[in-house]
């Protein structure tokens, strides 16, 4: 395990899903102190602070608490930030050895929020009053993202998609979007996601699906500090049968993009791992959020190894708003080395292939799956 880790410790990083502020990267922001660097915007840590009894004014309040060389030190070669379709994308580009690219995240638009649709119409110079106009606006913004280096989309979902209801039914639902029932919203969402999946496939993009989250469960806290502040939890068991029907519909017409699946509830991972055998363009994503602990990462690796193929894993990502989170890659590589080393020691994996397996999971698989033009240096 020690030797395997040593051989991947210095590999470059491909962070294909994060929430960093691209402007802070572009301007090479110098943080005034360690507190802001480590805690600023990172609701994972805010949650832990509350559990330890820290007063809210020290977390999201105004109480007082040098990113400069972090990306270079950790050898970060690729960062995919998470961006709203109306974002101007002014700060993405190549900075030193690091490529910073946008990710298309249309959650606000697919929620049919009136303000979001107005913003989308303005950004795309298109009337979004009809389903046809809404789709055109999404495609115009998607192409704008692709022109700025976008290779990936991302969708955070409160419920899983199912079969496509068809254009006629979707147009009727969209026309009365402000009065839809929960089931009708699910129908329309499934149609829109299928439409976008077609567009992603045509543009050779990767589609990420995040699900299993129950957001903003503390109403009083949400009213005080807003969303993404540490008041989200894990949902119970997710109905992956719906997801299977959705992916099958895409695959049947040759429109399934390369897809990464993330469930916040780890009990879904075995089902997702077997799903990748039925739909080889899909991958189980990294252990996410509450699960990227030592036990959670190890459990995810073992589950993928048992039910799918460990050698197809896309490795680690930060999914973070904090530059300090790049330490997670070393954490992951140590756990992976221990896991693979144990397999070798037990005679379950050939020693001659272990180093290649480590390098593929830590770097090569993500580069190949995302079809990035990166050279290992």
Question: Could you say what each language-model-derived stretch is?
Answer:
Residues 3-5, 65-72, 88-99, 119-258, ...:
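Histidine/acidic residue-rich metal-binding segments in metalloenzymes
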Residues 13-25, 206-215:
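Histidine-centered catalytic micro-motifs
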Residues 23, 208-212, 260-262, 284-287, ...:
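Short acidic/histidine-rich active-site segments
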Residues 85, 106-108, 157-159, 213-217, ...:
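Active-site-proximal loop/turn and secondary-structure-junction residues that shape catalytic pockets
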Residues 264-267, 284-302, 350-370:
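C-terminal helical cap
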Residues 17, 79, 153, 210, ...:
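Divalent metal-coordination and catalytic microenvironments
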Residues 1-8, 16, 20-121:
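N-terminal hydrophobic targeting/anchoring segments and the immediately downstream early-domain regions
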Residues 1-12, 37-63, 310-311, 328-377:
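Mid-to-C-terminal alpha-helical segments outside catalytic/metal-binding sites
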